[in-house]
């Protein structure tokens, strides 16, 4: 499936030859007139080729192609080999791996949630083959739901993305599934965390033809943790996770492509099976995602394509406390979308892309105890998006991108919101196309939010959508920088940026329990900084250095203040890591082993420090009309301690740094390959602080810290056949 266009052809007789590996050569003689436009449809017939040998000397870097063809967008890619090289906990993780890219901040070893250039984690649009995934994390955020064996590549757009992308304001993470080659194959693995398997192949040609396709290939995978099964004879292990994912790709004889992607996954943490007297705090916590998408693509004559997509996605979680009057909390969100995108190439220098989408979003939250519902809410809304963008390219000289996106949001409660979002990018090439200066600016909008307590290392996402009581987010952004290549091996870039956020939300600590409309508080924010990257693309030793500088702020009204109007409180959010450095390297080891190394250094993230405490006392009336100060029965008469806090997030944890290494080796067998691997997290056992707690009974109070991962060795085995 492809296209070509030849212009300024001298009139006369021409012989056209087309050849492709695995197909018979095609030859045709054409007569071209002075003003004649000749259209030619070519269909190659399959033909086996007998070759003495093929030597592949080099392949064109995808990073080089993006450098030449993208204007202002900041795009970083990791392929499967790079994902596997980055050391991790237990097994390769596509989402964990992007933490090593510039502009990406992670706040904890225990959370795979990421923050890009001063945006919160819910401001990242995460797409699996174009299907949005709301909360793609297992075990409270410890690692992601994506099976690395099903992934072809991961692409992060951390800024300056074009008008075709809407719905989030911070970044776009595109995860592309691998449909396989059509040959029957499989991958299986077992780690300390889970076991997984993925198989792929193609339907028989007769079956494919009966469905109207030239060929249909597929790949499906399953993953499950196994501790609950392993320990079941001895005791009930309370946790397990499951993932199921599939991708099916069909090609019609005319070259159209139909792709179907589906995913379902769930976590279950069940302590309700323990007898009442055996455990004082029983809970039943389960959460998961479901997603499905269909995409039809047709290549157009002269270049470009037409894509029509439909998808649906949902996320839900529930938390039950049976020992507290069956206290139950639940939250879920659903979305369904239909969209069409048309890409055309009217001339050799110009490209035009237009698209439209219709999306319905719905959420519901509830809180009940003792059979009575005390809180919660639900709402729905329709989002209509349209965009148009034009691209002018003068190879090795100029790249200009102009676009506009228009979003119309119709909530169930409130008025229709219309947000135009202009976007522009300019790129100028120098030094024969090896150096480029670029600038991009645009507006981005978002109508969905996730609420979570930023102080909790294991988060529980509560998704809500905008309405008359919940503002939508508007972010104006500008970025500029230089990037270039040195030979074919080295790529470097430096970018600065500024972002404003209007309509960020948080819980309202001063809400009126009798007023259901004041649960959410809207505010503003800013972020600015710079990202630097140096990357070696080829050779046995390769890798990159990424350095990020960031300053982020949030501003909300202080409704607890007695002043009118309420003063505003400005503070750095928890993901305001001022300096973040990542060094990643892949290198050959002895005896055929391949080593991977990651060293991460970051300044401390902010927290709210306790600066004092005081005892609580309570009066008791006694006989004779007097007062007696009493407490919990001891001589002090205290009833606990109150804590005096400093300004919000005005103190920072100590410097964070950690070294991780990995080792892999493949052993080829007649039927496939065995690949054992070892990961060693936090090699020198750095005690990075997760949070502090205080013992106020001591005088003076004693501060203690809870650390993140200690030195943590893990191993696993991968099988390919």
Language model feature labels by segment:
Residues 266-268, 362-367, 426-477, 498-519, ...:
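Surface-exposed extracellular loop regions of Gram-negative outer-membrane beta-barrel proteins
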Residues 592, 600-640, 652-660, 664-721:
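C-terminal beta-signal and adjacent terminal beta-strands/loops
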Residues 187, 193-226, 235-268, 283-307, ...:
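Transmembrane beta-barrel wall of Gram-negative outer-membrane proteins
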Residues 277-296, 379, 443-493, 498-501, ...:
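Outer-membrane beta-barrel signature, preferentially recognizing the C-terminal barrel domain
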Residues 261-263, 345, 349-351, 377-500, ...:
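Structural signature of Gram-negative outer-membrane beta-barrels, strongest in the C-terminal barrel
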Residues 394-400, 497-500, 520-609:
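Gram-negative outer-membrane beta-barrel transporters
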Residues 24, 30-39, 43, 52-162, ...:
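Periplasmic N-terminal accessory/gating domains of Gram-negative outer-membrane beta-barrel systems
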């Amino acid at each position: 499936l492809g296209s070509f266009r030849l212009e300024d052809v001298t009139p006369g007789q021409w012989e056209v030859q087309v050849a492709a590996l695995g197909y018979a050569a095609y030859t045709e003689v054409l007569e071209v007139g002075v003003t004649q436009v000749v259209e030619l449809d070519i269909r190659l017939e399959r033909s086996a080729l007998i070759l003495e040998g093929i030597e592949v000397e080099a392949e064109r870097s995808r990073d080089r192609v993006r450098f030449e063809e993208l204007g202002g967008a900041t795009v970083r890619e990791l392929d499967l080999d790079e994902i596997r090289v980055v050391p991790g906990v237990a097994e390769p993780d596509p989402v964990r791996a992007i933490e090593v890219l510039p502009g990406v901040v992670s706040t904890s070893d225990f959370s795979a949630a990421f923050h890009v250039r001063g945006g919160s984690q819910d401001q990242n649009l995460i797409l699996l083959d174009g299907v949005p995934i709301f909360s793609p994390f297992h075990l409270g955020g410890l690692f992601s739901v994506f099976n690395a064996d099903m992934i072809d590549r991961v692409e992060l757009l951390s800024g300056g993305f074009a008008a075709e992308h809407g719905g989030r304001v911070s970044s776009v993470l595109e995860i592309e599934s691998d449909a396989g080659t059509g040959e029957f194959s499989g991958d299986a693995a077992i780690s300390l965390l889970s076991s997984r398997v993925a198989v792929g192949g193609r339907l028989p040609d007769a079956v494919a033809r009966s469905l109207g396709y030239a060929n249909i290939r597929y790949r499906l995978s399953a993953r499950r943790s196994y501790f609950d099964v392993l320990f079941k004879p001895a005791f009930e292990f309370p946790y397990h996770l499951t993932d199921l994912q599939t991708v099916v790709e069909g090609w019609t004889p005319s070259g159209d492509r139909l792709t179907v992607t589906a995913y379902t996954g769930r976590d279950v943490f069940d302590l309700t099976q323990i007898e009442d007297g055996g455990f004082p705090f029983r809970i039943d916590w389960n959460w998961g995602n479901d997603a499905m998408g269909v995409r039809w693509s047709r290549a157009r004559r002269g270049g470009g394509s037409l894509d029509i997509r439909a998808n649906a996605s949902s996320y839900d979680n529930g938390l039950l406390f049976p020992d507290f009057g069956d206290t139950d909390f639940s939250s879920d969100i659903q979305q369904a979308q239909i969209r069409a995108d048309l890409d055309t190439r009217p001339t050799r220098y110009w490209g035009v892309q237009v698209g439209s989408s219709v999306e319905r979003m719905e959420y519901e939250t509830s809180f009940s105890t003792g059979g009575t519902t005390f809180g919660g809410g639900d709402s729905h809304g329709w989002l209509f998006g349209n965009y148009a963008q034009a691209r002018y390219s003068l190879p090795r000289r100029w790249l200009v991108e102009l676009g506009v996106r228009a979003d119309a949001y119709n909530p169930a409660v409130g008025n229709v919101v219309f947000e135009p979002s202009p976007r522009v990018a300019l790129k100028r090439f120098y030094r024969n196309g090896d150096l480029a200066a670029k600038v991009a600016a645009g507006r981005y909008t978002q109508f969905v939010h996730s609420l979570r307590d930023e102080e909790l290392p294991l988060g529980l996402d509560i998704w809500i959508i905008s309405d008359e009581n919940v503002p939508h987010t508007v972010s104006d952004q500008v970025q500029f920088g230089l990037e270039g290549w040195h030979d074919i091996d080295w790529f470097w870039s430096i970018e600065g940026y500024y972002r404003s956020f209007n309509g960020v939300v948080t819980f309202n600590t001063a809400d009126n329990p009798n007023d259901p409309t004041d649960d959410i508080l809207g505010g503003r924010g800013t972020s600015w900084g710079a990202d630097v990257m140096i990357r070696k693309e080829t050779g046995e030793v390769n890798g990159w250095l990424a350095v990020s500088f960031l300053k982020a702020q949030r501003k909300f009204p202080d409704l607890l203040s007695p002043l009118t109007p309420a003063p505003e409180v400005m503070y750095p959010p928890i993901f305001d890591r001022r300096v973040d450095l990542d060094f990643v390297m892949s290198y050959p080891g002895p005896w055929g082993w391949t080593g991977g190394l990651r060293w991460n250094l970051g300044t401390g993230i902010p927290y709210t420090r306790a600066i004092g405490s005081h005892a609580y006392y309570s009066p008791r009336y006694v006989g004779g009309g007097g007062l007696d100060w009493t407490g919990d029965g001891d001589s002090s008469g205290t009833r606990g301690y109150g804590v005096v806090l400093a300004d919000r997030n005005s103190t920072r944890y100590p410097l964070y740094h950690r070294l991780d290494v990995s080792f892999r080796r493949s052993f080829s067998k007649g039927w496939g390959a065995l690949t054992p691997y070892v990961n060693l997290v936090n090699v020198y056992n750095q005690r990075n602080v997760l949070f502090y707690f205080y013992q106020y009974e001591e005088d003076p109070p004693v501060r203690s810290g809870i650390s993140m991962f200690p030195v943590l060795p893990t191993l696993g085995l991968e099988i390919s056949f």
